[in-house]
Amino acid sequence: MKNVNYAKLFDLTGKTAVVTGGVGILGKCFCSGLAEFGANVVVLDIDENAVFEFAKELTTTYGVKAIGITCDTSSPSEVRHAVKLIVKKMGAIHILHNNAQGKTASVNFEDCSLEQWRMTSSVNEEGYFLMAQAVGKQMISQNLGGSIIQTSSIYGIMGADQRIYKNSSSKGKTMGTSAVYSFTKSGVIGLTKYLATYWANNKIRVNTITPGGVEDEQNETFKKQYSNRIPLGRMALKEEMVGALIYLASDASSYVTGQNIIVDGGLDAW
């Protein structure tokens, strides 16, 4: 039997990982997890001060190289500039995590304007397309293969239960899930499957992570109503999404592509 160091399969030392939406609630955890497993990390987000500060924090905490780059992923010129800058400062790109999220305020489907629809789709669809295209081209030119991971949502694979939003709020704002959010997150899964076969000969693997509801200052009413629908009986902690990312980013998943790992406490198993 071949002697395999199974722990080493998860080692990301020497790899460069790019994370969009890098200073968001999940983005920070994803960046930290990648850094802890040895990856050099590029934090991409639209918040200029936050990306630089968080990149410094990653370097101090984990001893890896980390840089912050301000980028609106829905802008073709900004995406091209960001990828060029990453290659200049970091060398090859081995991992892309398409994780930026556009989400408009909750609005009834009947009242949603085209402008509101496009605000979300510009990030969740066009942004994912632009980043995957630009980084995919770079990975092909490097001839080293690579791993692309894209964040979908539980509402990309099932309809939102409107009942759980009754009397619910988060950070003082009324909660709800818009149709465009569900529509775009479903499209992320389709893009993943397409690219997984399209780039298979280039040894670029493409997979999706689909998170369920993550605890983030929602009121107790929402937490209870959401948790009652979950077989495990609670909302997710943001840290619980990281294991799936490390698996998909690393050689531990070297024979996995085109897949969607659902981290939802069993919600879609009912």
Where are these predicted regions, by residue range?
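Short C-terminal tail/terminal secondary-structure segment
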Residues: K2-K8, K103-S106, N167, I246, ...
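Canonical Rossmann dinucleotide-binding motif of NAD(H)/NADP(H)-dependent dehydrogenases/reductases
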Residues: L9-V42, L195
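The beta1-alpha1 cofactor-binding region of Rossmann-like NAD(H)/NADP(H)-dependent oxidoreductases
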Residues: E48-N49, T70-A82, L114, E239-E240
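Substrate-binding pocket helix/loop in short-chain dehydrogenase/reductase
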Residues: V107-F109, S113-R118, Q162, Y226
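Catalytic loop of short-chain dehydrogenase/reductase
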Residues: I140, I149-G187, T192-A200
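Short, small/polar-rich loop/turn modules that mediate ligand/substrate recognition or access, typified
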Residues: A200, R205, V256-G258
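A conserved structural motif in NAD(P)-dependent oxidoreductases
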Residues: I230-M241, A252
